């Protein structure tokens, strides 16, 4: 990987951490803290999520998910692997495995149902 490509990836990781902070999460890019340990997420700060960040024009989602899954398991924190990816001049998208997405959705649904019950007395 060339320097320009590495720099582009680092900028995206910093930008992603900044976006997470906008939502109230204490997020940071990890490369400068962890080096290349193999199990560190690209960005820390979303509890329970292993963040793999990719800013490239050619998508290799299955390869990236495999990397995220391996790294999440190696980290031993039981985090759900997720790939945050984008192309130039495009929105950030998130890819997760189906079962992991359903797990998140069930948690959201349970919180939503609880909120409705509290509002309806």
Model-based region annotation:
Residues 1-121:
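Catalytic phosphate/metal-binding cores of nucleic-acid and nucleotide-processing enzymes, i.e., regions
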């Amino acid at each position: 990987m060339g320097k320009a490509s590495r720099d582009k990836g680092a900028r995206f990781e910093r930008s992603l951490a900044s976006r997470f902070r906008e939502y109230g999460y204490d997020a940071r890019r990890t490369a400068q803290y962890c080096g290349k340990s193999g199990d560190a997420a690209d960005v820390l700060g979303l509890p329970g999520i292993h963040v793999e960040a990719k800013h490239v024009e050619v998508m290799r989602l299955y390869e990236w998910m495999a990397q995220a899954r391996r790294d999440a398991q190696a980290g031993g924190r039981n985090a759900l692997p997720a790939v945050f990816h984008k192309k130039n001049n495009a929105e950030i998208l998130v890819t997760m495995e189906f079962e992991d997405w359903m797990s998140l959705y069930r948690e959201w649904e349970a919180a939503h149902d609880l909120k409705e019950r509290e509002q309806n007395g």
